[in-house]
Amino acid sequence: MALRDTSIPEPSGPVPPAPGACATAPPLDPTDRGRLLAGAHHDPHSLLGAHPVPGGIAFRVLRPFAREVGVVVDGERHTLASEEDGLFSGVLPLAGIPSYTLVVAYEQGETQETHDPYRFLPALGELDLHLIGEGRHEQLWQALGAEPMTHEGVTGTRFTVWAPNAQGVRVATDFTHWDGTAFPMRSLGSSGVWELFLPGVGEGTRYKFEIHSRYGHRFLKADPMARAAEEPPNTASVVTASRYEWGDAQWMRTRADTPVHEAPFSVYEVHLPSWRPGLTYRELAEELPAYVKDLGFTHVELMPVAEHPYGPSWGYQVTGFYAPTARLGSPDDFRFLVDALHRAGIGVIMDWVPAHFPKDDWALGRFDGDPLYEPGDSRRAEHPDWGTYTFDFARTEVRNFLVANAVYWCEEFHIDGLRVDAVASMLYLDYSRDSGQWEPNQYGGREDLAAMAFLQEMNATVYRRCPGVVTIAEESTAWGGVTRPTDTGGLGFGLKWNMGWMHDSLEYVAHEPVHRRYHHHEMTFSMVYAYSENYVLPISHDEVVHGKQALVSKMPGDWWQRRANVRAYLGFMWAHPGKQLLFMGQEFAQGAEWSEKQGPEWWLLDEGYHSAGDHRGVQDLVRELNTRYTRTPALWQRDTDPAGFRWVSVDAAEDNVFAFLRYGTDGTPLLAVSNFSPVVRHEYGLAVGDEAVAWQEVLNTDAEEYGGGGVGNPDPVKPEDGSIRITLPPLATVWLMPYAL
């Protein structure tokens, strides 16, 4: 069956008749001809298109599935002679290269008039190439990939790709049945970039790059810079352009007014495909913002949105770094979701995965036949934990690819924060590697200096270009200066996940209350280092999968006690210095582990379910925690200032009690007291000093509306000799604030 060339618009009128054949063109050099047909020629534009020769202008066209090809000049059609192998040529007695089109006839009688891709000058400028060569193109997506545009007065798409080791590159499309023979690209010198402008190609066209390696192998690769991709399991890239009109100008204008460290920051972590399985980006925009706003969270954190082939990877094995996953809709549909969240007053953080990428043969791995995005040293290229490739952070073009990608999501999709995954695996050369499987750095150390420099460059660039954006590190070691500015030697992140607090506190609450006295330090140790970095306290997806159990199921005791433990824990967490993050489903005490196949168990909240009130009670507490948190500056204004915290009771191990004060910038305190024992403690003394003339309970996780027993302090409590005596409910946290008598 003949292949239909849809790369060019249909002619506006009838195809001109063919008056006759052209003169014979000089033959191609056999070597050039062989390389051209093999897809291994660096400059096909020097062979194809129109060129002066003795006697006129020679035209040469490569259309392997055509029956006949003609040239139309000034409305007259001239038939080119077949040279076999899909080549057609001829000479017209012209003084100069004219404006012309091609008429291509296919075997089944279909005929099209088209522009010739090989009559155009490069559609990529010298400045772009210079910046790419230096690794400093901060808007790389505007230079590489598939860019719909008007070039020399003709609409089409410019295709560009970085493949410095390739002998040749061709554009293969759906309309050529993935045969790239007709569309070889030209090399733009030492930049390693290949380019071709295809007239008439528009949005929705599926394409790949056909790479001819220096080893003689030919294979198809998805575009590393593709801004859209087919829905998996299909793997082609898709030409796209955004026409989205944003409605979040007010949000974007004001998001940088207050530093994130001095503002409320309560995060709801979401896996979009499973939050409400089956919903698209636009359908999620109808439900997610309203739900998050109702619960009082200030931000959502989206597990990776970039395209990935394997759903159960949850997005952490990315193949399309510049393309939102097509599973839920188009790139503009994703913009619609972000816009809806912003208009609801919700910030959007996105998980970003620059540590590694999968080995799928159509993706980044050995992209041009050689290690390109990954290091050439196999000891460094392989990630031992995940069976993936690591990025070559020492290569300027690779760093540019990743730094520009971070900027891309912030500028093109209005993302407010990037949570960088697996930072520790990037920073250490010996991460998960045995002796002999890694090589020390130039100073003999285990630190990956190139990865460190990359993270510093990424952070500095994002903060310079994108005011109000915050970067967050998932860094699980004691690497110093993760959130210290880059100009003082730090990595430059805005926040860091406090993995130590998470592990220690979950370890503590998992013990039976009678044994917690022996683990008291696990709840207090975090304050030893609480101000060494700017922390987020994460109860993330990683803690509720793979046998770790859901948060409520980690707790000891019967159902009432497990819920009480969760409520007490959340009250402690929200009051502790640092921002907080909670994964979906934990806000209503889902008992089952998270599964990406079914998502949260929303049916637990249904009125007809006999225990729905128990789950709604925890959900109501989370709503109240966020409401109180946002309205109480003492809980967020001085998260990074040691003067914003004071222990009141730090060593009451026998009682399982913790008490501390938080202070706002104006000195107004909040007293948080947690009783992790199952007994009521009456007249419990706390030396609060002269902070207030009286204290009023403002939150009690044991309140009946949250599913508790209703034990508490309904009346204001006055200090005597600097101490107050209050009732501590069992397995509960209470917050008290100054009360004006």
From Swiss-Prot:
Name assigned to this protein: 1,4-alpha-glucan branching enzyme GlgB 2
Region (Disordered) residue spans: 1-38
Oligomer and partners: Monomer.
Alphabetized CDD domains for the sequence: AmyAc_Glg_BE, E_set_GBE_prok_N
Organism: Streptomyces coelicolor (strain ATCC BAA-471 / A3(2) / M145)
UniProt keywords, alphabetically: Carbohydrate metabolism, Glycogen biosynthesis, Glycogen metabolism, Glycosyltransferase, Transferase
UniProt cross-references to PANTHER family, sorted A to Z: 1,4-ALPHA-GLUCAN-BRANCHING ENZYME (PTHR43651:SF3)
UniProt cross-references to HAMAP family, sorted A to Z: GlgB
